[in-house]
Regions:
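Nucleotide-activated sugar donor-binding and catalytic core shared by glycosyltransferases
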Residues: 1-163
Length: 163
């Protein structure tokens, strides 16, 4: 199963639609998405199952059962996927497209783009090609755990003021 997660506060129509177009071409693949609030006119996928929100326990179960994660560039989702050693495909929200108030997600993907197991899609077309790649390849991920002291964790501690 492929798990799509866009966070709970904002919908992410560009990513939801890109995954939906990919699913239309790959009906044999099981995909489940957590898409945020779509009741205000947001994109509603027709080719995969989805919900607006999940409890933490439901999120964890879906993440655990997934082959890989397709997500916005939210730091919580990235770290959770890496902790579970799941490859993650990130598409950053962009302020110029009114997807967020600023471009911090672009900075996030720049920081993680060289991390083993992290893939970046800057356009909807990239989402499809990266999903094709992830479905056809065994991908190694960065080994990260809650006790890690590697460069990534040290960097995050520095940024968060904990190191």
């Amino acid at each position: 199963m492929i798990f799509v997660a866009v966070g709970t506060q904002l919908r992410f129509d560009r990513l939801a639609e890109a995954v939906d177009m990919w699913c239309k071409e790959h009906p044999e693949r099981e995909v489940f998405g957590q898409l945020g609030p779509v009741d205000d006119g947001g994109y509603r996928p027709r080719h995969y199952n989805w919900t607006d929100a999940l409890t933490k326990a439901e999120f964890d179960v879906n993440l655990e059962q997934s082959e890989f994660v397709v997500a916005h560039a939210g730091i919580g989702t990235i770290l959770t996927a890496l902790l579970k050693q799941k490859p993650v495909l990130l598409m950053p929200r962009r302020s110029e497209l009114a997807e967020h108030r600023n471009d911090h997600q672009l900075a996030t993907v720049r920081r993680f783009e060289d991390t083993k197991g992290v893939f970046v899609a800057n356009t909807p077309a990239d989402v499809g090609s990266q999903m094709d790649y992830l479905c056809s390849t065994v991908v190694a991920t960065t080994v990260l755990n809650e006790f890690s002291d590697g460069p990534l964790v040290k960097y995050l501690q520095k940024v968060l003021g904990e190191g």
